[in-house]
A protein has these predicted regions:
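Membrane-lumen/periplasm interface segments of specific transmembrane helices
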Residues: 233-290, 301-302, 306, 443
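Membrane-interface alpha helices of multi-pass inner-membrane proteins
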Residues: 110-111, 185-200, 342
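Perimembrane helix-loop-helix junctions
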Residues: 143-154, 205-244, 365
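Transmembrane-helix motifs of polytopic, lipid-linked glycan transferases
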Residues: 80-101, 139, 143, 319
Length: 685
């Protein structure tokens, strides 16, 4: 055991150092979500149903770091945690291979295969759940193999019971009485799987190879027929009890205690999470199989993963018969593992490399054992180890350079775009961006918290008509508060996924570009083109209220610009502008402004009215946003329904002084069934 611990202590720090030296500065959507959650949310809101433990773990790490004087985001803390877990996982895998093959070369090459795999390496330098989960899975794999080979000890004897005609006990069997019992191994397996499930819910799938390991443990030295079922039940309980306590206890505590669900329907809806959306899963067709090939290749290496994967499969094919001499349980446990995880993720999302990390340890275990089979002193075959060496050595520079490129913020289009958008916006402005990581880059990197996307709108509402209304409400809220709105051209008309790539969120939701563009059609007259920078995606802009006040004013033939109306109903008119049917005390109130009285000499307004009432009034809102007769200007409308331009002299107007935080226009004093159309309003210097 000391030998294996030495291998672990040698390998783990090497790969942990490699990961720490290659930490990414370009994050995935999920990674930024975790970082922002840990940085900003209270601990009660950190329990994601699909990876229940990761948010609280991050919060605990950040809290401990703050106590030691750490300042800033949890970003690097969480990355360092993943890097250390990744290194420990590689070291543990190397120790397992040394235990099974008795070859240090096999252990070293297996460690290099796992540690240099693109998916494993990338998620060891990112803020994601998969590396920590993989550590528990590797430890669980070790226990499953131990359990499959561990016989029951006979009371009063130092060695295991040997069935009549059976082989002599191996050295591992002879120490069974001194080592862990089958029940202890089963309990350890249940505990490790429970922890893996808390870091990613899909690791409930490990129960299938786990049950195979339990069955093999029973078969290693079958108990007497009369006690067989009792022994099986005891072993199953030893495994299931910690698994149930860890997983069931955690979910019940969070769901019923922390989150406060008061019905089982709500609780199970929360636990099911993404599975209820319909965006993932579905029939396995040719397109999914093509994405499967892409996902598996990129899991191993990017680029060149397909070629290296074929080389590894060749090692398996050429030496598969030799796997028959592998330690008991290796084939049945690993093949069950690969079949179950593979079937689920082919159905769920085959192109996503993060989901294939869980299948790397059993796959590489088979490959290494095929290249380094137990030989009983016979010389090793040469082709397998040589091909394995070439493959492993090729993965290191290929994936290392790819990860460094991907993690370089200066090469990241989304980071460059976020920085450029910050230069064209204020912190309170609303930014509607294409689906993807940009909606998180903006709040995290450039302090633009009001960033939303089509995907966010659909999640908030559940259906496209409601999502469209939600988007318009957010736009109106921003404009009414005096802020600008920036809308990506690709958000107005979402681009389809490139050939061979996974469908976009809009495509998953069944939304075509024309349908989305129709939602933004009412805004088109008011949109102003904006180019954030050379070579960057195009945007459109709805200017902020202050910008319009200091510039061209408000053209109501193009939009409402955040002005609010009270005491009037919408109307129709053949004349251009904002048509209203006045009721009692009709008013139009501007967004918040900061007007300098000395800067403007007149207020010009063009409007038409066919009402009997012809008295109009404009108020200059005080520092509290309140209107007062003493801070207003009255005038009478010209006779007739035609539109007229009125120029009001502000130089001697009552209240046109001091702090002015907005305008209120009363186009007429009261309604009488007629219509008022306000065409435009501006402040003249």
């Amino acid at each position: 055991m000391r030998r294996y611990a030495t291998i672990l202590l040698l390998i783990a720090p090497l790969f942990a150092a490699l990961y720490l030296l290659t930490l990414t500065s370009v994050h995935t959507f999920d990674a930024l979500s975790y970082i922002l959650d840990v940085d900003r949310k209270p601990w009660r809101e950190l329990f994601h149903p699909h990876h229940l433990a990761y948010g609280p773990l991050g919060a605990g790490i950040r809290l401990a770091a703050l106590g030691l004087g750490w300042q800033g985001s949890a970003e690097r803390l969480l990355q360092a945690t993943n890097a250390l877990a990744g290194g420990l996982g590689v070291g543990l895998f190397a120790a397992l291979l040394a235990r099974l093959t008795r070859h240090w070369q096999a252990a070293a090459l297996g460690a290099l295969l796992l540690g240099a795999s693109y998916a494993y390496w990338y998620y060891a330098v990112e803020v994601e759940v998969y590396t920590i989960a993989a550590l528990f899975l590797i430890a669980a794999l070790w226990l499953m193999l131990e359990l499959a080979q561990r016989p029951a000890s006979v009371p009063g004897s130092a060695v295991a019971h040997v069935p009549p005609g059976g082989p002599a006990p191996s050295s591992s069997h002879r120490v069974a009485a001194r080592g862990a019992t089958r029940a202890q191994l089963a309990a350890g397996l249940g505990l490790l799987q429970g922890l893996a499930v808390l870091f990613h819910q899909t690791n409930v799938l490990l129960s299938f190879p786990g049950l195979v390991a339990l069955w093999l443990g029973l078969q290693a030295t079958p108990p007497a027929a009369s006690a067989r079922w009792r022994a099986a039940l005891a072993l199953l309980c030893a495994y299931a009890t910690p698994l149930t306590l860890v997983v069931g206890g955690a979910y019940l505590w969070v769901g019923l205690g922390v989150s406060g669900f008061r019905s089982w329907e709500a609780f199970f809806g929360w636990v099911a999470g993404y599975t209820t959306t319909g965006y993932w899963g579905g029939a396995v067709d040719g397109a999914k199989l093509a994405l499967l090939g892409q996902g598996l290749a990129r899991t191993i290496a990017w680029p060149g993963g397909a070629l290296i994967g074929l080389a590894l499969l060749m090692i398996l094919a050429l030496n598969f018969r030799r796997l028959g001499r592998a330690p008991r349980g290796v084939l049945s446990i690993t093949l069950t593992w690969l079949a179950v995880y593979g079937a689920f993720f082919i159905w769920w999302e085959p192109e996503n490399i993060e989901f294939w990390i869980a299948s790397l340890p059993p796959f590489y275990l088979l490959v290494v054992l095929a290249a380094y089979p137990p030989t009983s002193g016979q010389p090793l075959p040469r082709l397998g180890p040589a091909l394995l060496l070439v493959s492993a050595l090729a993965m290191l520079p290929i994936n290392g350079s790819a990860i460094l490129r991907r993690g370089d913020a200066t090469r990241d289009l989304q980071r460059v775009t976020a920085t450029a958008l910050a230069a064209h916006s204020a912190p309170g402005d609303l930014l509607i961006v294409p689906d993807g990581v940009l909606e998180l880059y903006l709040p995290f990197y450039v302090e633009r918290p009001q960033a939303i996307s089509l995907n966010q709108a659909m999640i908030a509402t559940g259906a496209w008509p409601a999502a469209c209304a939600w988007l318009h409400a957010r736009i109106e809220t921003a404009l009414s508060a005096g802020y600008a709105v920036l809308i990506a051209a690709d958000a107005i008309r979402p681009l389809p996924a490139p050939p061979g790539e996974p469908p976009t969120p809009a495509e998953r939701m069944g939304l075509d570009p024309a349908t989305v563009a129709e939602c933004y059609a009412p805004l088109q007259p008011a949109l102003e083109p904006l180019t954030p920078g050379p070579g960057l995606p195009a945007y459109y802009r709805l200017p902020a209220a202050q910008e319009l006040a200091n510039g061209p004013g408000w053209d109501f033939t193009r939009g409402r610009w955040g002005w609010r109306v009270t005491g009037a109903a919408p109307a129709t008119s053949s004349q251009p502008g904002w048509a209203l049917r006045p009721e009692s005390d009709p008013t139009l109130i501007s967004p918040p402004l900061r007007l300098e009285p000395a800067r403007f000499t007149a207020l010009e307004v063009r409007l038409a009215a066919d009402t009997a009432a012809r008295d109009a009034q404009v108020f200059f809102l005080d520092g509290n946003g309140q209107a007062d007769e003493a801070r207003s200007l009255r005038w009478r409308l010209e006779p007739g329904p035609a539109a007229r331009t009125y120029r009001l002299d502000l130089r001697a107007a009552p209240g046109w002084e001091g702090v002015i935080t907005g305008l209120r226009l009363d186009p007429v004093s009261t309604g009488d069934g007629g219509t008022v159309v306000v065409e435009w309003l501006r402040l003249a210097p």
